[in-house]
């Protein structure tokens, strides 16, 4: 239905969607709630320095990164996606909602020139062997499916975030609940500790030493 009417509500705001983007889901709003808590807990010494940087990787419609910017204006937000078609929609949503964001075409963090304080990532995590609801057939396969039991891109961004995040920075990922233990174990071996898990969201903190 969202593709027919051309928009979907997320965190109280309407976002344009097309077949180049995933449809925003209520479950993803938990990531915003967790982010707000993390920013609130950020030591004052960091808040006094240049703006905290956030990158929304695999941004799609931009719903996560744009919402983060509107809820937390102090953040410097970049919307990144490998798909230029998705980025065109993210740009439109950002402009329409008056969110001051930067748009970047990038394969995960490859083209991002900074260390981020926060990374949000709702990457493809569906394995093609899973039974999936019929409505997913209309959503872009590039944004849905991944190899390695659905964890290929999630593992890749954990590896990249080991240098792409500031020490003590946070990586927030969305995945199926059945995958969260495997993600946590993989992250532990790559310099991260799990600090929170809520529904489909897992929060990983880069070790400071």
For the regions a language model picked out, list residue spans one by one:
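Conserved beta-strand termini and adjacent loop/short-helix elements that scaffold enzyme active sites
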Residues: 18, 104-106, 197
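Short alpha-helical
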Residues: 23, 84-85, 127, 152, ...
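Generic C-terminal helix-cap and adjacent flexible tail
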Residues: 41-42, 206-209
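Conserved SAM/SAH cofactor-binding pocket of Class I
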Residues: 30-132
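Conserved Class I SAM-dependent methyltransferase catalytic core
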Residues: 149-206
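Conserved AdoMet
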Residues: 1-38
